[in-house]
């Protein structure tokens, strides 16, 4: 993926300045299918970007932040773990028109719904006409910006963290690797599409010795139809990311019983006893959401506060 070699891949603001304008030492090491970029700042902040090449012409990267100094770091904000441009042919600006663009030529964004408690869960319609945001899944010079995010700190609530940008027979699929609140912004440029993804509202500093990683991204360019691209993506996930069938892992998923986390202790124990009593061939018991928070009706507001509900 040549376009990655000439880009910084991520961005953030450090103590009010664009990171790439700050005083720092940058080193790049290549080791086979992996490239490691390190940024060392005078105050001891160390940023490590690790890029791995996968099958199906895909790349993955993740950022690590570490305080190697003796004092707290400066403030890290506006952190975009992915900030790159995917090359696409230029589109001419056409100005206002009462007609929809040519559906066979316009750039489309397949951005599936997440869990929305409806018949449209994980459904993507790039030609949807929304009265409040006309064609929210098209990217054109006249409508160059689109923004997507999830809800409630749950990675696939309202919006799933998977995207497919396609123009005619060329496209790119990418996914955000984060289990909390994320944000994705797309901008049509003369050179292509600027893709930015991040953990929403980052604003933090690191104490001496602290080290964290932030969200990851996997990006896969393709040529051909949407169906071909989706199958290419499935092969990538199965071969490089799924644990099923890998050394030390079973060839199939476990057969489990799902129990609502808001159920009382007595209710949970009763069901486990019934499983044992009737020798139901369950391999595992899986506890769903609701075991945390202040009450059964408030579980959705307490994601991230993993304090068990004593009731």
Where are these predicted regions, by residue range?
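Short, flexible loop/turn elements at secondary-structure junctions
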Residues: 55, 69, 178, 199, ...
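Short Pro-Gly-centered flexible turn/kink motifs
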Residues: 204-223
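Aromatic-lined carbohydrate-binding/catalytic grooves of carbohydrate-active enzymes
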Residues: 248-311
